[in-house]
Design a protein with these regions (language model features):
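Alpha-helical transmembrane segments in inner-membrane proteins
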Residues: 1-348
């Protein structure tokens, strides 16, 4: 009876956590849209968003056209993109850590970041700044295909081969990018590349969030159904074999989906590090290791985290904007040091 009561309490606590995070996300979105170089009352922000969504323009008739443009056309798309990016990167990090059975893995292990950087760098140096997102996505896809090809060649894909392949491809594309910068980049190009590689949501708009929204939502729904396989992956290949599960096949499918999500997000936002590393760890403190519970918490917490990181990037310096990657690194780097030193990862 005591065990049944404990399970019931655990379920109740989990429901409370989910409700709290959902409420926190809604409050975060409204507050983030209100904050910026020009602060807007939360009540006005709510009226504008609610009026636009319900097509009741009379609700926000008292607001100026400039205020409406700031809220609806500039800030809301940006906040929604940061929500999608945070949720997507955190989800990919969670799945990656289960897939390779390594708690300090993140999506960029597939070479996505270095491939995207190469594609973006090439187009920036060539003066084709309008096509940077497309170039970054193509570069990310090429790098991922190389990693998966190397890791699965001449036998089944293993976690060790995947990590080694990712390391090699990352080094290769980083060398290509550095060569292009050294040979053909001017001062303006270098600044653009530097800002892009540290992440930015400055170019967010309604049209630019359509693809990330479709991809992130679709992949999220898929992985919400894959908790049994993800839990099995955490137990290791030998356990999976006894259960009759082909982990090599699932790894290929999961890695491909992770690469697609990460590639789309990187092409839209640049390189934003540590989200896929730290959010799954923090989420496990609330949801445990069962991915049926873990995945929803990861998605909500990742979205909230990146929205606030973007708020800091927008408001911390007056009349200027900082790369969002600075703030994710300031939180992520100390946390990474903590989990390596305190959790004894990598020790025999």
């Amino acid at each position: 009876m005591k065990k049944v009561n404990d399970i019931s309490k655990s379920k109740t606590l989990y429901v409370v956590v989910i409700i709290f995070l959902m409420a926190a996300l809604v409050i975060t979105v409204i507050t983030a849209v209100s904050l910026g170089q020009v602060n807007i009352k939360v009540s006005d922000t709510y009226k504008i968003i609610f009026g636009k969504l319900t097509h009741h323009d009379e609700i926000f008739n008292s607001s100026s056209k400039a205020m409406i443009a700031i809220v609806w056309n500039m800030r809301l798309p940006r906040v929604l993109l940061s929500l999608l990016a945070g949720a997507g990167l955190a989800l990919c990090g969670c799945v990656m850590q289960a897939t390779v059975n390594n708690p300090i893995s993140e999506p960029y292990i597939l070479g996505v970041s270095s491939g995207a950087t190469f594609g973006a760098t090439l187009l920036i140096v060539m003066g084709l700044g309008a096509f940077v997102s497309g170039g970054a996505f193509v570069g990310a896809v090429i790098a991922t295909v190389m990693v998966l090809g190397i890791a699965s060649g001449h036998g089944k894909m293993t976690t060790t081969r995947l990590i080694l392949a990712g390391t090699v491809v990352n080094a290769l594309f980083t060398a290509f990018s550095n060569f292009i910068i050294s040979v053909g980049a001017n001062a303006d190009s270098i600044m653009t590349i530097k800002f892009w590689t540290m992440g930015s949501l400055a170019n967010a708009g309604w049209k630019s969030i359509i693809l990330p929204a479709v991809v992130v939502i679709a992949v999220t729904l898929f992985f919400c159904t894959q908790y049994r396989i993800l839990n099995t992956m955490m137990l290791g290949d030998e356990t999976a074999v006894t259960l009759g599960i082909n982990l090599s096949l699932y790894r290929k499918v999961y890695m491909t989906l992770i690469a697609v999500v990460t590639g789309v997000l990187v092409s839209s936002c640049g390189i934003i590090g540590f989200v896929g590393l730290i959010i799954p760890h923090i989420s496990r403190a609330f949801a445990g290791t069962n991915h049926k519970r873990l995945v929803p918490v990861v998605i909500l917490l990742g979205a909230i985290f990146l929205i606030w990181a973007d708020v800091l990037a927008r408001v911390l310096v007056k009349n200027a904007e900082l790369p969002i990657g600075i703030f994710t690194a300031l939180v992520g780097a100390p946390f990474f040091i903590y989990i390596v030193t305190k959790k004894n990862y990598g020790r025999e």
